[in-house]
């Protein structure tokens, strides 16, 4: 049965998180691995699709079939990746991550989840927003709302604070940077201005370390480790770990044995990096956050003295270098009471609660991050909606023809801040035909822009003379049609069925292995009490199970069949031992007299010991079963 809950999802570049409203408060949901964040990593290993931690864990040995940071390519219609011999768009890869999130949330809540609120960087353009919405639909969600990440974080911060205040949200994630300024008060969250850089994030700090290590190694040994995919993946993981360590330590040491091989043998990489060195390597990156921050303040017509609170969002804000820069720019120490990895997901859950009716008295007024307009004569960009306009919104403007007797106009829709249309992002184009022939400048063509609450754009053009109309909803990424989305949904569902079948087979195999252990324990501990013929039968059945376990092509049914046969033999042992124990107890009671309770046939006799071993075996098998299942997911 489907739940009426709406899931709040932070679909991140390096990690994702998801939350739901419980008892009036947003709560992070732990994933299938028991963790509060999920790596945004997808891989195929021998045809098996892995998502999250299992995918990240095998990246070094399988770099060619592992995809990370796909969010950086959302909305790029000419970008795809090859996995397991097939081409996938960024929307499809993101959908695989969202599908795992959906599955884990449903397992945690015990209900089907059909609806979601998904966050995006505030500076995402229309294509990227639509691509994110498409990914959610491919994964099987009804995407109720697309929310800007800094806005969501502010909601998580201000849920229990009714005071009026101006908040600056500094959001440095794995792949994007946003800064937003919001006015909070009386349950209203109004975004005043936003700015950012979609090509700046924690990955870039990692790359700075990677390049430093690779350059040092090449200078010493003449080998560029970046040319070897496996070596590069090891460098990437080591760089990320070093970055994290340097947030709490003054120096760290990187040690990668056998990173390369020469005719003289293997080579190791050993390098010490101090925090000072790391900060000097990334000084240009931190400087890139200054311009957007100052621009957001200018757009809001605020100075840093107008800011009451500063909130840090994104794991990359844990770097001391970043915190120092933020304090220098804003004149105050950032708040530390919001978990930078979880705030966005918690805010998304709050917005989901608003939509589902679980949260009252909250109003979200977000803005469009970039100006929207059309190309006019001379290739100029004519704005219809300025950046930082509160959404939803609608604007119209009258245009005319440039030539005599022109019967068709091409409407080209752009988003950006450059004065030349071609230097901005082309969102889409369509033609309006059937304009009655007339001298240039005579026809009146009304172009209307509409931006919904998700920040997704619809453009309509109407010839006022003839009444002819055309419109376009700007599509994201590859411009996925409903049919394409449905096809991808079916593909995702097919993978879900395959995953379920794989899980059932693994469970059947685990039970077969456990039945062998139970049988062997029983035989070892009760060899004297078990009939020789019955013992031979059990040993034969154990061999049958082990033979199936050695067969890589064995099916779930194969495992279940041999397990059932062995279990039946174990039941026969149980019957025999029970009868023997009953007879011993009767004999002891008949011959012991007043001291019978302490006689040799009491509860501590051989039958009792066997019963105790069986019970311990059951407990051991349950724990081992869970370990095997978890281990399989992690492989």
UniProtKB/Swiss-Prot annotation:
Q: Would you tell me the protein name for this molecule?
A: Chaperone protein DnaK
Q: Which family does it belong to?
A: Belongs to the heat shock protein 70 family.
Q: Where is this region: Disordered?
A: 487-538, 575-635
Give the matching HAMAP family.
Answer: DnaK
Compositional bias of kind Gly residues: 588-611
Q: What does this protein do?
A: Acts as a chaperone.
Example GO molecular function: ATP binding
Q: Where is the composition biased (Acidic residues)?
A: 522-536, 616-635
Keywords, A to Z, come to:
ATP-binding, Chaperone, Nucleotide-binding
What InterPro entries does the record tag this protein with?
ATPase_NBD, Chaperone_DnaK, Heat_shock_70_CS, HSP70_C_sf, HSP70_peptide-bd_sf, Hsp_70_fam
Pfam families in the record: HSP70
State the coiled-coil residue ranges: none
Chain intervals with Basic and acidic residues compositional bias:
492-521
């Amino acid at each position: 049965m489907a739940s009426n809950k709406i899931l709040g999802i932070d679909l991140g570049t390096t990690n994702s998180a998801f939350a739901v409203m419980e008892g009036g408060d947003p709560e992070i949901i732990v994933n299938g691995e028991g963790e509060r964040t999920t790596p945004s990593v997808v891989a195929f290993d021998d045809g098996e699709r892995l998502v999250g931690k299992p995918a990240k864990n095998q990246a070094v040995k399988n770099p060619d079939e592992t995809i990370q940071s796909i969010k950086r390519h959302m909305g790029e219609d000419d970008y795809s990746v090859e996995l397991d011999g097939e081409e996938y768009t960024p929307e499809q890869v993101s959908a695989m991550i969202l599908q795992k999130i959906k599955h884990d949330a449903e397992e945690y809540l015990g209900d089907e989840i059909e609806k979601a609120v998904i966050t995006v960087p505030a500076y995402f353009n229309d294509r990227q927003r639509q691509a994110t919405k498409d990914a959610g639909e491919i994964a099987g969600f009804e995407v109720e709302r697309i929310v800007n990440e800094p806005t969501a974080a502010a909601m998580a911060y201000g849920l229990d604070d009714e005071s009026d205040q101006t908040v600056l949200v500094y959001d440095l994630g794995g792949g994007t940077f946003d800064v937003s300024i919001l006015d909070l008060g009386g349950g209203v969250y109004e975004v005043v201005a936003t700015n950012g850089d979609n090509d700046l994030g924690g990955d870039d700090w990692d790359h700075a370390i990677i390049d430093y290590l690779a350059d040092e190694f090449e200078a010493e040994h003449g080998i560029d480790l970046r040319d070897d995919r496996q070596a590069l993946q090891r460098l990437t993981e080591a760089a990320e770990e070093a970055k994290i360590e340097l947030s709490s330590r003054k120096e760290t040491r990187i040690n990668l044995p056998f990173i390369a091989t020469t005719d003289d043998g293997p080579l190791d990489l050993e390098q010490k990096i101090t925090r000072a060195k790391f900060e000097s390597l990334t000084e240009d990156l931190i400087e890139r956050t200054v311009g957007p921050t100052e621009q957001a303040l200018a757009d809001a017509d605020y100075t840093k003295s107008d800011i009451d609170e500063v909130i840090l969002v994104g794991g990359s804000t844990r770097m001391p270098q970043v915190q120092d820069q933020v304090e220098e720019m804003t004149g105050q120490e950032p708040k530390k009471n919001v978990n930078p990895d979880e705030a966005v997901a918690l805010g998304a859950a709050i917005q989901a609660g608003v939509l589902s009716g679980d949260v009252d008295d909250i109003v979200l007024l977000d803005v469009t991050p970039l100006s929207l307009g059309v190309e006019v004569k001379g290739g100029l960009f004519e704005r219809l909606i300025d950046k930082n306009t509160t959404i939803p919104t609608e604007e119209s403007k009258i245009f005319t023809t440039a030539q005599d007797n022109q019967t068709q106009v091409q409407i080209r829709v752009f988003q950006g801040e450059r004065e030349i249309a071609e230097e901005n992002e082309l969102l889409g184009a369509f033609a309006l035909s059937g304009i009655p022939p007339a001298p240039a400048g005579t026809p009146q063509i009304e172009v209307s822009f509409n931006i919904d609450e998700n920040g997704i754009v619809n453009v309509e053009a109407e010839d006022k003379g003839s009444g002819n109309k055309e419109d376009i909803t700007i599509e994201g990424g590859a411009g996925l049609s409903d049919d394409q989305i449905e096809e991808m949904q079916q593909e995702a569902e097919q993978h879900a069925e395959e995953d379920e079948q794989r899980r059932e087979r693994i469970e059947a195999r685990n039970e077969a292995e456990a039945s062998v252990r139970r049988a062997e324990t029983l035989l070892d501990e009760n060899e004297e009490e078990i009939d020789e013929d019955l013992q031979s039968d059990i040993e034969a059945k154990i061999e049958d199970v082990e033979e199936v376990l050695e067969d890589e092509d064995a099916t779930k049914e194969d495992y279940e069949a041999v397990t059932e046969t062995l279990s039946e033999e174990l039941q026969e042992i149980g019957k025999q031992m029970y009868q023997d124990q009953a007879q011993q107890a009767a004999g002891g009671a008949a011959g012991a007299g007043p001291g019978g309770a302490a006689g040799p046939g009491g509860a501590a006799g051989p039958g009792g010991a066997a019963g105790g071993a069986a019970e311990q075996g059951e407990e051991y098998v349950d724990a081992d079963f869970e370990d095997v299942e978890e281990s399989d997911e992690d492989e």
